[in-house]
Amino acid sequence: MSAPTLAQALRDAARAGLGRLDAQLLLLHALGRPVHDRAWLFAHDDDALPEPARARFEDHVARRAAGEPVAYLLGEKEFHGLALRVDARVLVPRPDTEALVEWALALLDAPAVAVAAGDAPRHGSSGPSVLDLGTGSGAIALALQRARPGARVDAVDASADALAVARDNAVRLGLPVRFAQGDWLDGAPAAAYDLIVSNPPYIAIGDPHLPALAHEPAAALVAGADGLDDLRRIVASAPARLRDGGWLLLEHGHDQAGAVRALLAARGFTHVASRRDLAGIERCSGGRRAGPPGRSADEDLGRATGSAGATVK
């Protein structure tokens, strides 16, 4: 039996139910070529698919058709310009989470945060201090550290397996994020932070979409009967670990913004707001720990929260 051409292999993948982009990425990976080199496929669609690339591709097609994420098959996922290594030990970073990163960066640039960060040295640095809870692959923490190298970024996860992935990403990217194992804020270093960010589990136990996520770690996805269990815990404990005027930013489900804003307001946070993702969905919400800011600081923070996509409640 003759080897199929690359074009035939892509048609076979389509018949197996794969989308065109997924099939192209997996074929490039099987051939040992960069996954961004899709133009090469168009120029070589009549080339034969040799062994063992054919066997690798057919295996990946079958696994993708069974629901395994493309990122796990490739071993890599791009997030906020970073090429992160990922596997079944961690949740696949989603583009939606970049809305949380952009909001955090806007707050870190606000003069009010810079002034608070200069009040006292922490970890030998006068830059702002950031804590990422439930870091997983390290996506949020590493994106913030790369974009703001003067910040001191700590990251916590309860999973030793996830932390191994995150640490590997940090070493490979040369980013000095500090990692610690523990249960939310119980695992954080003994410090007060200017900014706490988190993309915690927020899917309800009975959510009908869960079967489609069966290949990803359930502990990173599911949070009780209404999906809010971990969000409640973080909101309740965060004020004790925030400096006066510090911010808490949380990713949540597409229909949870109102509930999360209510949790933040009930805990005494001010400037409570939500920010929309690229699809126009309120994807993350946050608030500011009450403190004694001056008038100009409030105005600076208002600009940071009111910029593109934010809805102030």
Q: Which residues make up each language-model segment?
A:
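Intrinsically disordered, low-complexity terminal tails and inter-domain linkers enriched
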Residues: 109-129, 290-313
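Residue-level signal for inorganic ion chemistry
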Residues: 26, 67, 97, 140, ...
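Non-catalytic accessory regions of SAM-dependent methyltransferases
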Residues: 1-41, 49
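Conserved Class I SAM-dependent methyltransferase catalytic core
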Residues: 226-287
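Conserved AdoMet
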Residues: 28-107
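Conserved beta-strand segments of alpha/beta enzyme cores
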Residues: 83, 152, 176-178, 270-273
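Mobile active-site "lid"/loop adjacent to the S-adenosyl-L-methionine
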Residues: 200-230
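Conserved SAM/SAH cofactor-binding pocket of Class I
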Residues: 98-212
